């Protein structure tokens, strides 16, 4: 809940946190180890649970999290057609193509929600403006766009969309270009020099 704090008179202990985590991981925390090392897991429905604790480092990489201290539940929701207002700005109707587009806003304002719906509309096509659907490739590095669960997108990202997740943007873009020949590539959270270089290529 972004706009209000709800405080209850109950102190959760570490044993209870681990029990909750085990249930979220279907009693197989090991199967979710890679996601846990990234600080979150994605569960069925596309909901995301942030995890904090003590990082175990090896060769400058996080190989585990121990002493889990907090869980932060982010309830996923789709807002269909929220991209309607911007589609006219990013579509070249004459050539039936997409302009290079960057969505920018402060945290928590709906960038990912807007991006997801934009991908869906571009992928499906928009008959009302005679826009034919495009093959889309999504690099879902943190699993927030398509919210894949056991290989199945939990969010509607369109009928012509291929998704690769849990991979860096640079590697994911190369993979999609080499194997899927997308007409449009989308990704979320451009935050590093490597991300910028991958896009510029």
Question: What is the predicted function of each stretch?
Answer:
Residues 1-45:
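N-terminal accessory targeting/assembly segments
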Residues 29-97:
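P-loop NTP-binding catalytic core
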Residues 48, 56-57, 78-80, 99-101, ...:
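Conserved nucleotide-binding/hydrolysis micro-motifs of P-loop NTPases
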Residues 51, 140, 185:
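Conserved RecA-like P-loop NTPase ATPase core
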Residues 98-120:
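Glycine-rich phosphate-binding P-loop
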Residues 100-102, 136, 184:
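Residue-level preference for the first positions of well-ordered beta-strands
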Residues 123-174:
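P-loop NTPase switch/communication element
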Residues 180-201:
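Conserved P-loop NTPase nucleotide-binding/switch module
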């Amino acid at each position: 809940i972004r706009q209000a704090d709800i405080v209850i008179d109950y102190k959760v202990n570490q044993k209870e946190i681990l029990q909750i985590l085990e249930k979220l991981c279907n009693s197989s925390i090991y199967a979710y180890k890679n996601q846990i090392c990234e600080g979150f897991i994605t569960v069925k429905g596309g909901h995301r649970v942030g995890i904090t604790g003590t990082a175990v480092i090896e060769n400058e990489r996080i190989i585990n999290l121990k002493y889990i201290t907090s869980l932060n539940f982010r309830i996923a929701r789709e807002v269909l057609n929220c991209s309607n207002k911007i589609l006219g700005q990013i579509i070249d109707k004459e050539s039936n193509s997409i302009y290079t587009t960057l969505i920018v806003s402060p945290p928590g304002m709906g960038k990912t929600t807007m991006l997801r719906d934009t991908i869906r509309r571009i992928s499906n096509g928009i008959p009302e403006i005679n826009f034919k659907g495009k093959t889309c490739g999504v690099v879902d590095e943190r699993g927030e766009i398509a919210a894949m669960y056991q290989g199945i997108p939990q969010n509607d990202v369109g009928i012509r969309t291929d998704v690769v997740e849990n991979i860096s943007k640079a590697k994911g873009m190369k993979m999609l270009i080499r194997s899927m020949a997308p007409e449009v590539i989308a990704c979320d959270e451009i935050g590093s020099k490597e991300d910028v270089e991958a896009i510029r290529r």
